[in-house]
Amino acid sequence: LGKLKKEDNFYTFQADVVDEHQLKKVLLKYKDELPKISGLVCSAGKAPIPKKIEDTSINEWNEIIQSHLTGTFISCKVFGSYMAVNSYGAIVNISSVVGYNSGPVLAYGAAKAGVINLTSALSTQWAKDNVRVNAVAPGWTDTPLLRPKERKNKRDLTPILNSVPQNRLMTTKEISNVICFLLSSNSSSITGTTIKCDGGTLSGAGWFPYGGFPNKEKNSSPYYLEE
């Protein structure tokens, strides 16, 4: 962002996405100074901590739901409604594969499932206003959040990699490529869709009862059963 700030057409604003008043102030202050707002990416959210339901407080639940789902709702309400009035725009909401499959991050999974449903609903509401609304559901992605540099002991990523048919982490570049595509005119007929960018994680979930994923060796598919 430091480099981009030097560009004449780049601006940064700080606001709390769960505060509708703050977002409205940003819109009202800059809508006449900036070019037409034509794109919105809702990606803000607090990192979840895996816990059992018995160990999850109401405050912890609310914090995750607010940051991932309520923040997306308010951002879409403020900026998406503005796009609808101007009959032009594209919105990309960030969901997750956990929005489809359960995991020990209860509030996070519920919030990301809600983002998928919200995306579908808004895409229908604003279709005739020429505002497209889609979502991206990333899988395990190589970010500092997953393996921070300050971690003394390197995290064993083997269980994660073994759950991905491509046997690797997604990159932020791959996720951003999908986001840019959905914001562009190249996806002009796509709305109400959630694109999974997960290396096949969700598609491969049903293979584990049969021994796991196939490998490259001939006749070595794990689902092969000897007589």
Locations of regions flagged by a protein language model:
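Short C-terminal tail/terminal secondary-structure segment
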Residues: 50, 180, 191-227
